[in-house]
């Protein structure tokens, strides 16, 4: 009995509740976190069309205090037929069909409390199963950059980049032309 009280006191001092998050609670918490995350993706990153979740999993649950958790999530997204201006729920929209439909793999850290669900960080990059080729360029947004402004603006762009260079053609990656690397010797290229 003394051991249990000491263990509970230790867990409380380390800001852990010591109480497990049960599977049913985890599922509803993860669903709520995924909805908030997809709202952020569609508000900040999507072009003309909405994106929808294709797959998802919880990588890790980090307890921060009593009823406060950080969920580390992995999920995939793909563009749908619904226009962003339609106001439709993305989960009710059909996926676009085609060879070059944008898709991405994302990771997110979402803080869930009893009152609030907040995206702490979000990172999406070209999906490995996507048909687009070339080098990959990931985009990352941190908590202070994810605040959606009430005026409906898309939010701040990373310093040094314009929105056009970050998200050309409504895709999460851009094609980069390879630059010739000088050889460093005096022999010229006779094939030019």
Swiss-Prot record:
Signal peptide: 1-18
Maturation and modification: Multiply phosphorylated at serine residues.
GO cellular component: extracellular region
Major localization class: secreted
Listed Low complexity bias regions: 128-137
Cellular location(s): Secreted
InterPro entries in alphabetical order: Cystatin_sf, Spp-24
Disulphide-bridged cysteine pairs: 82-93, 106-124
Swiss-Prot/TrEMBL keywords: Disulfide bond, Phosphoprotein, Secreted, Signal
Gene Ontology BP term (one): bone remodeling
Gene3D superfamilies: 3.10.450.10
UniProt-annotated stretches for the region Disordered: 124-192
Matching Pfam families: Spp-24
Family affiliation: Belongs to the SPP2 family.
Function: Could coordinate an aspect of bone turnover.
PANTHER family attached to this UniProt entry: SECRETED PHOSPHOPROTEIN 24
Name this polypeptide is given: Secreted phosphoprotein 24
Organism: Oncorhynchus mykiss (Rainbow trout)
Name of the gene: spp2
